[in-house]
């Protein structure tokens, strides 16, 4: 099947097929040249486009009324599932220049396995990734759904579908499952149901939402995740419909600020309300916010705390010290000023706390070379960031012989 790409009024392109392996040929060459086969590489934040399997996912909904409403809306609206999922305004394909956005739809999977498994393995093999932690894409907006019951039903359906259709087929693919955070009791039950499933390495809260993480209703969920020795992640996102973000008139602006803003709010509440003291063994991961905001937060919170420590009586040390014990995903790593980046690495103890993430197949993804080629990180530090830290954060056990990759 050919797909016409409307690149401009003057130039059009008809594409007969799309192959991830060809797209990432240079990434494959990098992985060979740099010898990635000599140490584990774990990608803690990759994505798939679950809307391309949306009708499959809806079959896993329990509520027959909501299932019928969702199926009808999805059938009417098409693959994006508009009418079911909250809309996210944005121009991630940069006016058609990032061609894999439309072209991925015509890429075929391999016989005998789910298409999501095939496509994921192709980019993993090209980049030299041993294990990838997979997240949804449009569903990162699900926390903004006006109907809490719909968020809960879709979250449970997606989690069940992912475990049965994807994670069970390929041990190299793992996931931190979606928690419907607008319903604290449903979140708790989600951890109970899925905490021991194969391929589940933790749980994830989408950050673009308006529920305070310090609310007492979530304490038993945090306690259960801690008891299971699993990490909890806050995955960043943006919401252009939010009033303060609506003042920005360009996608570049809301993408730059939105992906940082919500995690800044949640991390502040997490630290100031002493949740690291209440759950000292619960590992927290802050995903897809980049790194440049962290020195600012450390300095800002420390400065306020030194003047008003009575308002954070549960803390036993500076906010920055709690932050240095947390984990952070690397992408999108701000590399415009190497001196500033080196300072950031030092402040967050990157060699033990930073986790490599690609964010593939999103438009601003980072290859492992983003970490491997840094001039100021030791060889041991690079290997820690690319895989060793994730093994510790997720308790991932790799076989003695590294997982085979396609040559």
What are these regions (language model features)?
Residues 47, 137, 208, 237-238, ...:
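Flexible loop residues that form catalytic
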Residues 3-4, 153, 166-174, 179, ...:
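Catalytic pocket-lining loop regions of alpha/beta-barrel enzymes
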Residues 147-152, 370-373:
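Short glycine-enriched, charge-decorated loop/helix-capping segments at active-site entrances
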Residues 46-47, 359-361:
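Active-site metal-binding loops of divalent metal-dependent hydrolases
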Residues 41, 46-47, 103-110, 121, ...:
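Divalent metal-dependent hydrolysis catalytic cores, especially in the metallo-beta-lactamase
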Residues 2-40, 55-131, 160-168, 189-192, ...:
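Mid-to-C-terminal alpha-helical segments outside catalytic/metal-binding sites
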Residues 49-52, 57, 131-134, 140-145, ...:
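Short catalytic/ligand-binding loop motif for oxyanion handling, primarily in non-cytosolic enzymes
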């Amino acid at each position: 099947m050919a797909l016409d790409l409307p690149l401009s009024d003057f130039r059009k392109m008809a594409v007969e097929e799309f192959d991830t392996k060809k797209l990432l040929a240079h990434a494959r060459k990098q992985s060979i040249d740099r010898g990635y086969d000599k140490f584990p590489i774990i990608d803690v934040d990759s994505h798939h486009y679950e809307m391309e399997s949306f009708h499959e996912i809806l079959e896993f909904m329990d509520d027959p009324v909501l299932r019928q409403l969702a199926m009808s809306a999805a059938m009417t609206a098409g693959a994006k599932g508009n009418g079911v999922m909250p809309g996210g305004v944005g121009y991630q394909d940069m006016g058609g220049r990032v061609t894999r956005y439309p072209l991925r739809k015509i890429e075929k999977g391999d016989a005998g396995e789910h298409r999501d498994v095939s496509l994921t393995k192709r980019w993993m093999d090209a980049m030299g990734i041993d294990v990838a932690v997979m997240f949804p894409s449009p569903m990162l907006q699900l926390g903004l759904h006006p109907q809490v019951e719909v968020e809960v039903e879709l979250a449970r359906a997606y989690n069940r579908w992912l475990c049965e259709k994807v994670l069970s087929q390929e041990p190299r693919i793992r996931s931190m499952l979606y928690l419907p955070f607008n319903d604290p009791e449903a979140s708790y039950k989600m951890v109970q149901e899925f905490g021991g499933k194969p391929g589940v390495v933790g749980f994830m809260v989408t950050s673009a939402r308006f529920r305070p993480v310090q609310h007492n209703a979530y304490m038993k969920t945090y306690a259960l995740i801690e008891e299971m020795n699993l990490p909890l992640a806050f995955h960043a996102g943006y919401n252009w419909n939010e009033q303060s973000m609506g003042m920005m008139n360009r996608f570049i602006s809301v993408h730059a600020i939105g992906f940082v803003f919500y995690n800044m709010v949640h991390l502040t509440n997490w630290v100031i309300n002493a949740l690291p003291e209440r759950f000292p063994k619960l590992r927290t991961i802050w995903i897809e916010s980049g790194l440049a905001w962290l020195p600012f937060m450390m300095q800002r919170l420390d400065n306020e705390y030194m003047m008003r420590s009575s308002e954070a009586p549960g803390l036993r040390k500076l906010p920055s010290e709690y932050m240095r014990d947390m984990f952070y995903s690397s992408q999108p790593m701000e590399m415009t000023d190497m001196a500033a980046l080196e300072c950031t690495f030092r402040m967050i103890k990157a060699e033990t706390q930073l986790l490599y993430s690609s964010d593939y197949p999103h438009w601003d993804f980072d290859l492992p070379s983003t970490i491997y080629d840094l001039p100021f990180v030791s060889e041991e530090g690079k290997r820690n960031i690319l895989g060793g830290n994730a093994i510790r954060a997720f308790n991932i056990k790799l076989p003695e012989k590294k997982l085979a990759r396609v040559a």
